Curated annotation (Swiss-Prot):
Family label: Belongs to the methyltransferase superfamily. Archaeal-type CbiT family.
Protein's UniProt keywords contain Methyltransferase: yes
Protein name: Probable cobalt-precorrin-6B C(15)-methyltransferase (decarboxylating)
Catalytic reaction equation(s): Co-precorrin-6B + S-adenosyl-L-methionine = Co-precorrin-7 + S-adenosyl-L-homocysteine + CO2
Organism: Methanococcus maripaludis (strain C5 / ATCC BAA-1333)
Length: 181
């Protein structure tokens, strides 16, 4: 995994933290022939890591800043098997052929999941920080007939202080894995 500090960052554009990327990549169970859609690509952390392990990645974000940040990181890490698009995933999904999906953004999520089901996408991994979004995604996947697994991860980083060491925690992330039955 590439360390978070190596990525170009832009104010207000999120990045999936290194440890969360590692687990999410594991849940995707990537194959070198996979073509992956990254919805809500943010700073491109997942796009870069997925592209290193798959045939091609389509990255989408509704933020122009996120699109630009992802593009910068793709160039920085010499990733050539990824294309970035600005727009709403539900409007762009039909333009691409892919077999796996990573979701880091939840705008219009229920409509997006319905479209993924129509395309018979067998493996989707979604990361959420907002509890209500986790419940919404889990419920929708179950309604659509997916097998759903989810885990909540809390990552803490060590920091040296004058009297010893402390652990500083980041926000917990729910990683949802949906597999078509």
């Amino acid at each position: 995994m590439i360390q978070d500090s190596e990525f170009f960052r832009m104010e207000g554009v999120p990045i999936t933290k290194e440890e969360i990327r590692a687990v999410s990549i594991g849940k995707l169970n990537l194959d070198p022939e996979d073509i992956v859609l990254d919805i809500g690509c943010g700073s491109g952390g997942m796009s870069v890591e997925i592209a290193k392990r798959s045939k091609f990645v389509y990255s989408i974000d509704n933020s122009e800043d996120a699109k630009n940040t992802t593009s910068i990181n793709l160039k920085k890490f010499k990733i050539e098997n990824c294309e970035v698009f600005h727009g709403d995933a539900k409007d762009l999904i039909s333009k691409f052929d892919f077999n796996k999906v990573f979701i880091g953004g939840t705008q219009n999520i229920e409509q997006t999941l319905e479209i993924l089901k129509e395309k018979k996408i067998e493996k989707v991994v979604a990361n959420t920080i907002v509890l209500e979004n986790s419940v919404k995604i889990i419920t929708k996947f179950e309604e659509l007939g997916y097998n759903v697994d989810f885990v909540n991860l809390s990552v803490s980083y060590g920091k040296k202080i004058s009297s010893g060491h402390i652990m500083l925690s980041k926000n917990p992330i729910t990683i949802i894995t949906a597999t078509l039955k």
